[in-house]
């Protein structure tokens, strides 16, 4: 009987993930502790917390290993660091995002009934943020039919990545419009920007949501910039950059889209009680990641990393051969401080926006400053974000100083390398940008088989083969008939 119950529970959860089945639960499936009347504020706070837990989990468990931030201390075969990416390598992000997108839809619907456009705008921002991560990770994913459980659709079709992006741009435009007249969130619940009625400067804080919407759109437009002929990317970028009053962007670190863990129940940093064996001993920073920081005397090391041998920051190889043995405690890993650090819940930072502007300025867009000025602001902002005082002369030293007379490609490489470090714990953005630009250039470990290529996507979770076989099959056919990690997405080609 217990086995049958577990199987039934698995099927129920999986169906909820696939089709966001959140309505019409029977009484036996209703949480007795859940309020009968759900307000937008109750939905928002829990959703905000769980979203960043999922995103930073994907950073630590997948993105960091793939992008040579960390590598497993012990690995005799396979592994993401050797470019072996399977359906289970990152399936948690699919499960988490689709579960939480049901909450986004509920927030949108509930707010609509109450005519609370500001809550609806926030729901659209979370929708764009989460779906952009999903489609950048997998390619075509359920989108237009993903929220139709109430209509009986438990097997949603997969939408083309292009169509998803086009709709998300429209959603962000709607959010920007609805937030143009900021007012406090009547039902509270905002733990990101504190746009709550009982918060000082709530109207100022609500304006930050609008800046996030437009900054996120700029990120996404740059992501698909190779497809300018199919989507009017350059026109939309120019419109945002030249109309600050209509499309306000982040202006400083105070605008960072970060869920700052308060350190109180129930919103603890998800790693606050992680065992040392799981947090530090199983993974170490790589030589690629640490050696650059050592060479630059990067002050963020003290925030991010442990030391060994009386203050040394040391990394291990990534993609190493099977006979390599890394001794426990001999190399640097995540610092204990990160486990309780409030600012770990990153969605998008001001530092990232400055690096986006640096690249756009390099490509000829009018941003108001030079590529170098944006580059230096990006580095400075990242230091401030992590509470790492920047040493005097840091920006002018060899290895950091911007080379404005170098080739355009070399300048882009400089920008992207610093952006890579600024992406620390920002879901899988470093991977997405590596696929778009080719930077940073990662060394290929001696233990990576010659046949293994740097992945462009994650294969779909295996449980979809039984829960949504027809539409999964159609999605696989659309990418060439083989569900593997080397198939490039629409914006990457």
Enumerate the language-model features and the residues they cover:
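Bacterial Sec-dependent N-terminal signal peptides
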Residues: 1-30
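Generic recognition of cysteine residues
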Residues: 15-16, 137, 284, 458
